[in-house]
A protein has these predicted regions:
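Conserved beta-strand in the GNAT
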Residues: 59, 66-75, 91, 96
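Conserved GNAT-fold acetyl-CoA-binding loop/helix
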Residues: 23-46
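Conserved GNAT acetyl-CoA-binding A-motif
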Residues: 118-129
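A short beta-loop-alpha structural element at the N-terminal edge
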Residues: 2-16
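Conserved active-site alpha-helix within GNAT-family acetyltransferase domains
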Residues: 108, 120, 132-150
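Conserved acetyl-CoA-binding loop-helix of GNAT-fold acetyltransferases
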Residues: 94-97, 103-116, 143
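A short helix-loop-beta-strand connector motif used in the catalytic cores of GNAT acetyltransferases and
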Residues: 43-59
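Conserved beta-strand-loop-alpha-helix junction that forms the acyl-donor binding cleft
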Residues: 127-137, 154-157
Length: 157
């Protein structure tokens, strides 16, 4: 598997994977997610892909250049903030591997690629949010050595 930057030609396949992720969340939290939808429109994806400095997206592709998985990154930095230091963070907005390709270490390779990208580009850390309705994702990130940074809680009224 090769890992490269996402391109506009990958959008149809990325959409399929975005729908898979959304459906996991919709099954776990139908009060918050609409089944069958996805996080981004074509226009939004084109804009994200074009902004290589602020939103790096990496795709893992097979020998036929078929996208097997992706990892969306967002560069975050609090410059001249009153109480936060100016560290540069790479936030993983989304990481997905096609459900038909799981258990082949694709997610691990994408995650490690993102860690290396962050190290090589002067980032302080890599962060992400994981939904409690997705215990498989939580277990994966725990296995990768990620540690809780903060806890986001809710009370449903």
């Amino acid at each position: 598997m090769e890992i490269r930057r996402a391109e506009n030609r990958d959008i149809p396949r990325i959409h399929e994977l975005l729908t898979q992720v959304n459906n996991v969340h919709a099954n776990g939290r139908p009060d918050l997610f609409k089944k069958g939808n996805r996080k981004y429109t074509d226009e939004q994806l084109m804009s994200i892909i074009a902004d290589r400095e602020k939103s790096p997206i990496f795709v893992g592709v097979d020998d036929n250049d078929m996208v097997l998985g992706y990892c969306f990154g967002i560069v975050e930095q609090f410059v001249n903030d009153n109480n936060r230091t100016d560290v540069k963070t790479l936030y993983i907005d989304d990481l997905c591997v096609d459900e038909k390709c799981r258990r082949q270490h694709i997610a691990k390779r994408l995650y490690e690629h993102v860690l290396n990208f962050a190290r090589n580009n002067g980032f302080y850390n890599v962060t992400l949010n994981v939904w409690e309705c997705n215990p498989g994702a939580r277990a994966f990130y725990d296995k990768c050595g990620m540690k809780p940074l903060k806890t986001y809680l809710e009370t449903i009224l």
